[in-house]
Amino acid sequence: GDDWQSIYAFAGSDIRYTFDFEKVFGKTSRIDLDKSFRFTQPILDVSSRFIQKNPLQLKKKIISKPSSFKKTVEIIENEFGNQNYLYEVFNKIEADRPNKKKWDVVILGRYNHLEKEIPDDLKSKYKHLNIKFMSIHKSKGLGADIIVILKVESGKYGFPGSMENDPIMNLVRADEQEFINAEERRVFYVALTRAKQKIFICTNSYFPSPFIEELKSEEYPEVSFDISSVNKALL
């Protein structure tokens, strides 16, 4: 199994069975799959660096293929909660689309109700893109050329969400939760690694997410940061 993608604690999954596999099941040998054919090396570098901030995650060194993009992760800041920022994101995707190839674009939300954030005419406006919405949990095991992650910000239904610290849920969670937002970090890792080519992360500077603040640091040179032109027009 892959401990980096263990995201079902809410259903009773216990990641200690991965960390302490040999203690539970007896003598074993570990074989790492050290090549990824799903996404490019910059996406791999960002996501693996991010997930291994938790010292309890198993350490792995994985290699992949190079990318044609100078920056493969782009953070789009939407300060005013205006849905029009998604048009800007999709204009960027259209501009990057090589040889008018029909790309698969998946919009990911930490929660299902975030689908209402998507403008009704998005699919009809961008007919050369195959657009769909999924929750991050539902997307596990799947992939798309481009991933757009909605509302990576703080708050109860943010990302990481404050609900992760629910005291009732903490009673059944593993001790590894001593590392802050451990489960949410893995969920975010799953979101990042659904992308084959490029990732757009949508956030709000008024409700900063610790994940965004981390990605904006010098540790992640593969990440670019931009303020939505919708916001610029309103300033």
Question: Where is each model-derived feature located?
Answer:
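Conserved nucleotide-binding/hydrolysis micro-motifs of P-loop NTPases
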Residues: 3-7, 12-15, 36-40, 80, ...
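C-terminal, charged and often intrinsically disordered regions of DNA end-processing helicases
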Residues: 107, 222-235
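Short glycine-/polar-rich loops that comprise or flank the Walker A/P-loop
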Residues: 2-4, 25-30, 69-72, 129-131, ...
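Conserved RecA-like helicase ATPase core segment
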Residues: 1-71, 161, 212
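Conserved helicase/translocase motor-coupling segment
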Residues: 80-142, 151
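Inter-lobe coupling/hinge region of RecA-like P-loop helicase motors
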Residues: 27-35, 56-109
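Short, aromatic/basic amphipathic alpha-helical patches
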Residues: 21, 117-126, 210-219
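Conserved helicase C-terminal RecA-like lobe
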Residues: 101-102, 127-130, 134, 139-205, ...
